[in-house]
């Protein structure tokens, strides 16, 4: 029995002292993963917004979808932060009967407020809604 106990203690000691190997994923395996929207029919939805020194706010919104889509609707609004909440200053809609759409507008804004762009894009196949997405941009002081 003493012999078994000695063998057991010796085995445990070897396990504790022996170096263990651990492997991690290489950095290139981790960085290859991209975080992005999980769209099925929409392939690209881009938005840009800027305010010039004279107060001219301008935005561009575009949406591209797969070839089975035959209607694209884009809604966009310039919002102003006033009295603790965001309020639409003006809104626009673009409807195209193809698999891509584009909307750009200009609008003069009043100084002394924050402004941002909020937009939505929806794609249809034979007038049946297939997918939609939305965007809320960063706020800009003017």
Predicted regions and their residues:
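Intrinsically disordered, low-complexity sequence elements enriched in Ser/Thr/Gly/Pro
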Residues: 1-2, 114
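Sec-dependent N-terminal signal peptides of Gram-positive bacterial secreted proteins and lipoproteins
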Residues: 2-24
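Mature extracytoplasmic or otherwise solvent-exposed domains
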Residues: 23-142
